[in-house]
Amino acid sequence: MIAIVDYGVGNLFSLSSSLKALGLEAEITRAPSRLRAADRIILPGVGAFGDARRKLDDTGLVPVIQEEAQRKPLLGICLGMQLLFDRSFEYGEHAGLGLIPGEVADLRDDLTDKTLKVLHMGWNSLQIVRDDPLFQYFKDGEYVYYVHSFYARNCADSILGTSQYGNVAVTGAVRNGNVYGTQFHPEKSGDAGLRLLKAFSEL
């Protein structure tokens, strides 16, 4: 069973539907016992980092997620991926879950072309930087769907794939041990995204 963490942030049903379309058992939950019983965990998320972290804290699931990430595959998606890092500088400084070394910063900090929209939204190709079982059904350069204006940086050792936006190589996919993350939305990325979710289900 794949547990989808419900903490009031994220498009849970779209993700659940994508997993079920693959014939996978998925459960939306905020019960610690269900996260412990799961074979894999997905941490979704949309919105602002600080607000999401507070909501996650309110569920009491932070220590459970940190503990289970040592024993089973965990996938953070979009803001869920950003929460995996040490800290974020989105509207202040906020602590992350500390599962992947690195930080989350505003794209504007690093974009040299100030005419580009700060919101990186739409389809972009993902360049595979490091081979990984997560990409066993994924081809280098396939297009995936992004919606974000903050991105993970100072995390070179964990990067699996990047997408170019202006002069910035946006961190698109990461891994640190059992902990994976995608800045893009696999559940919104068509067949390529479904194949990536299938690969995650087999890790």
Indicate where each model-derived feature is located:
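Short gly/ser/thr-rich secondary-structure transition/capping motifs
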Residues: 21-28, 56-59, 125-129, 163-165
